[in-house]
Regions:
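ATP/NTP phosphate-donor binding region
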Residues: 1-28, 35, 39-40, 73, ...
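Short amphipathic alpha-helical segments
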Residues: 38-41, 63-65, 170-171, 199
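Catalytic core of DAGKc-family lipid kinases
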Residues: 43-159
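Glycine-rich phosphate/pyrophosphate-binding beta-alpha loops
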Residues: 101, 105, 158-174, 238
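Short acidic/glycine-rich loop or secondary-structure boundary segments that cap or lie
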Residues: 106-108, 151-153, 165-168, 193-196
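Gly/Ser/Thr-rich active-site loops/lids in small-molecule metabolic enzymes
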Residues: 116-123, 165, 173-195
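A generic structural signal for short beta-strands and their flanking turns/coil linkers
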Residues: 137-139, 153-155, 179-184, 218-220
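ATP/nucleoside-binding phosphotransfer catalytic cores, i.e., glycine-rich phosphate-binding loops
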Residues: 145, 151, 177, 187-296
């Protein structure tokens, strides 16, 4: 068992030091805690299973992976779970779990008072975001992916592997797959006036991401170039200011242990067909670590 983290990067440093001594790692905390753990585990020489018990204000990744909010239920699902290899992002050499972003509201998570987050939870993020509506400005960007070049001014950019960002589940286009090696990218064009801003926000809330106000695509690698330094956010934490950013998808880089469900079903079937997993008589999937364990 690892001690409780006392400060930022405390969990990261402890896992880097001794994480590979364990057969499995289980953490409890918010998205920031999960991000620290994954960053540390991406430095490991071997893939060690990760169990996650959400205990933060928003818990975007837990929502995406259908991990229960109740801690005891989440712990039970880890015990009874199957392995699921999840894509991780790489941002100019840094790792992130579920989202990299720039522009409007992306700094709300780390700019919102921790006291308010502890007291009001997700509502604290919403209140902070509303205060920023009148200060929204666009960033001139050159975006390149898969041989395509997109140039324009954008108030928001999200490169994600999640169905929930800041607790909002409708901003990301449908069809998210957590292990396909692809990001979902959403770029929100800079509105020309207050009316267009209002229309853009309404369309985002309703998940009507039309070509007039949005650019959406899937990709395994994308670059962003800007004249001015642009602040970026990684998993709700500051990712620094950059004029050039390269983001790559590290396909199936982290192994979660999750309850068998629609998310894990396809990967479980592939593992069974490859002989990496068998099904018990009651239909429960079991991972085979040593092929000699299987009797002829």
């Amino acid at each position: 068992a690892l001690p409780i983290s006392q400060a930022k990067l405390d969990g990261y440093n402890k896992l880097c030091k001794c994480g590979q001594d364990y057969d499995m790692i289980v953490i409890s905390g918010g998205d920031g805690t999960l991000s620290e753990a994954v960053k540390a585990m991406m430095t490991f020489d071997k893939k060690i299973p990760l169990g996650y018990i959400p205990a933060g204000s928003t818990n975007d990744c837990a929502q995406s992976l259908s991990i229960p909010k109740k801690m005891l239920d989440a712990a039970r699902e880890i015990v009874d779970g199957v392995y699921f290899d999840y894509d991780v992002g790489k941002f100019n050499g840094q790792y992130f779990v579920y989202v990299a972003g720039f522009g409007a509201f992306t700094d709300v998570s780390y700019e919102t008072s921790q006291t308010l987050k502890n007291k009001f939870g997700h509502a604290a993020y919403v209140a902070e975001g509303i205060k920023r509506l009148s200060k929204i400005t666009g960033q001139q960007m050159r975006v390149e992916h898969d041989g395509e070049v997109i140039e324009g001014s954008f108030i928001l950019g999200l490169i994600s592997n999640t169905i929930s960002v800041g607790g909002m589940k409708k901003l990301i286009a449908s069809g998210v797959c957590f292990d396909d090696g692809l990001f979902e990218v959403v770029l929100v064009k800079t509105p020309k006036n207050a009316i267009e801003l209002s229309n853009t926000i309404n369309e985002a809330v309703l998940n009507k991401l039309n070509d007039k106000h949005f650019v959406t695509f899937k990709t395994s690698k994308v670059t962003f170039t800007s004249v001015n330094e642009v602040p970026w956010t990684l998993d709700g934490e500051s990712g620094g200011k950059h004029t050039y950013v390269e983001i790559e998808n590290c396909k199936q880089a982290i192994r979660f242990k999750l309850k068998p469900n629609d998310i894990t079903a396809e990967q479980t079937a592939v593992q069974c067909s490859a002989g990496d997993m068998i099904m018990t008589e009651d239909g429960h999937p079991v991972v085979i670590e040593d092929q000699s364990e299987i009797e002829d």
